[in-house]
Amino acid sequence: MVIVNRNVDIQNSSTERSTINFANKIILAPMVRVGTLPTRLLALDYGADIVYTEELIDWKFLKSFRVVNDALHTIDYIDKTDGTVVFRTCEQEKKRVVVQLGTSDPKRALMVAKMIEKDVAAIDINMGCPKQFSLKGGMGAALLTQPEKAKSILSTLVQNIKVPITCKIRVFEDVEETVKLAKQLESTGISALGVHGRTIAERPQHPNRCETIKKVAEAVRIPVIANGGSREIENYKDILQFKAQCGASSVMIARAAQGNCSIFRQEGLLDLEEVIMNYLKYSIDYDNSPSNTKYCVQNMLKELQETPRGKKFLECQTLGQIWLVTFTFIKM
């Protein structure tokens, strides 16, 4: 049974928070379904400086209530309609976790930010997601073509929220148009700007536009966080090379971390078996949903899912089954 307390914060959480510095950082990027608590904690263990959540939609937060989970020592935001966890965090990541918010409205964004600001290090507005769900809702990359609305959302948060506000964008075909937008967003007072080096229409198989990111970094004074280089990133040295190529202050890693979170280790990658076991320990310790745990492990196993043992893993339905089958899988 999950024990919750709606009134008392763990470790006397205070509204006074230190400012997170986005300069010269290696960061876990926001990733749908992947950026849940176990992955974030694992990334921090392996050397990530900052970790982003997956994109969380404003109305999902507004349908939730905040509780202190005394059993897990976490802060949970629970959906009022079905009891599922919208967002779970803990003291270990408190000063380094950034919630990425999907929103198209300044008022809703502010309502959510007021709810969560004492539990997070910063709040990021997603202005780069190219998925139809986001575009149809006026969120994500839809905001790239509505700079006034984008600025309104950011300004509202910067002026009313105590933690730093950032945003993440995609580039345009035209470099100057990208630079112009970056300057407009910077003018709102945001603390950093994440830049994915592909357009809305481009996908991971397309080359990352590192030169465009470099032009943005040269044009603004705030830290620019380069993103989109995972195709060429196989180790920590590659991360630094990507950073230099983009001329960026910091780097944000997505797919390379999804496949093996130890990409953040300066000492080099760990065996996938060890990474999976460490991930599963966090999943069990923090009661991560079996479906999400299974999805994240599948992204690590990749083609190994097609082996007989991999197919057995796909049949798992509970955390206990996942642990048992995975433990057997990696020992054989």
Task: Please report, for each region that a protein language model flagged, where it lies by residue.
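A cross-domain feature marking catalytic cores of carbohydrate-active enzymes
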Residues: 30, 55, 101-103, 127, ...
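Short, small-residue-enriched loops and turns at beta-alpha junctions
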Residues: 59, 143, 172-175, 199-206, ...
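Glycine-rich, positively charged N-terminal anion/phosphate-binding segment
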Residues: 2-20, 31-115, 314
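Non-cysteine beta-strand/loop elements that form the S-adenosyl-L-methionine
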Residues: 53, 122-130, 187-198, 250-257
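Alpha/beta catalytic cores of nucleotide-metabolism and tRNA/nucleoside-modifying enzymes
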Residues: 1-27, 32, 37-38, 45, ...
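Glycine-rich tight-turn/loop motif centered on a GG-T
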Residues: 69-70, 74, 95, 132-150, ...
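Active-site beta->alpha loop and helix N-cap motifs at the rims of alpha/beta catalytic domains
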Residues: 76-90, 94-165, 170-178, 183-186
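Conserved radical SAM core fold
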Residues: 56-62, 106, 127-141, 197-202, ...
